[in-house]
Amino acid sequence: MNSPIAFKAAEQTMWRLVQRYTGRVGYRRGVKSEGLSLSPPVIDCSGWTTLLLTQAMQAENEATGRAVFSADDMLALHAWSDRIIEEIGTRTGFILEARKITADTFPRYATIGLKMGEPEWANNHPRSRGITHIVQVVCSPEDGAQFVSESYGGSVSPGISLTPLTEWLALSENHLRAGEMWVVDPFRLASKAQG
C-alpha cells in the first residue's frame, strides 16, 4: 500500500488543494483547471485529477531541488480520463485491472479509472477500456488516512468531493466486480525520471 518514497511535499500539496476546493467547486464536463476561476467555479474529473497530480509533482520537484518528475510526464497528464490512465500505465509499466486490485496491490496515491456506463457523448469520442471517469487517492498528512477525491457530475452533490477510500471502494464494488476499474500509480513516474 505504501510507495517506496515518501513524497511528503506532493502529499501535502494534494491535501491543501482538496481542503481548498472540496464542496466549493461544481462539475462541468470538458472544463479543466481554468474553470476554477469562473463564477461559480467548475471542473471535470480529468481536469481535477490533472491539477492534483501536476501540482503535487511540481511541489515534489521544488522540495527536492531536482526533476523527480519530468516535464514531459506532467504534460502527458493534461488529457481525458482514459488517456491519463493509459499514459501513466504505459510510462510506468504498471496497471492493475479490476480482478488484481486488492489491499496489498493498491498504491498509496492511486489514480483510478472507471467505466461508468455508456454515456451518449462517448459515442463520438471512443475511450480506451471504455473509461469515462477518473479519481485520485489523496492522503491526510496528519494520520496517513487515504481518501478519494473526485469531481463528479452525478445528481447528488455534483462537484469536488472527498470520501474515505474504504467507503468509496465499497460504493464502487459493482465496477470492481464487473471488471470496469483500473488502477495506476502516478508516483512510479518518479523512478522513471531518475533513470
Regions from the language model: what does each represent?
Residues 65-158:
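...with weaker cross-activation on analogous glycine-rich loops/strands in unrelated enzymes
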Residues 23, 91-93, 167:
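N-terminal compositionally biased, intrinsically disordered segments and leader/signal-like regions
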Residues 27-29, 156-159:
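Short, solvent-exposed loop/turn elements at domain surfaces
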Residues 1-78:
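N-terminal capping segments
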Residues 15, 145, 157, 178-181:
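Low-complexity, intrinsically disordered short peptide segments enriched in small/polar/basic residues
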Residues 151, 163-195:
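Low-complexity, Gly/Ser/Thr/Pro-rich intrinsically disordered linker/tail segments
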Residues 10, 81-82, 96-98, 178-184:
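Generic structural motif
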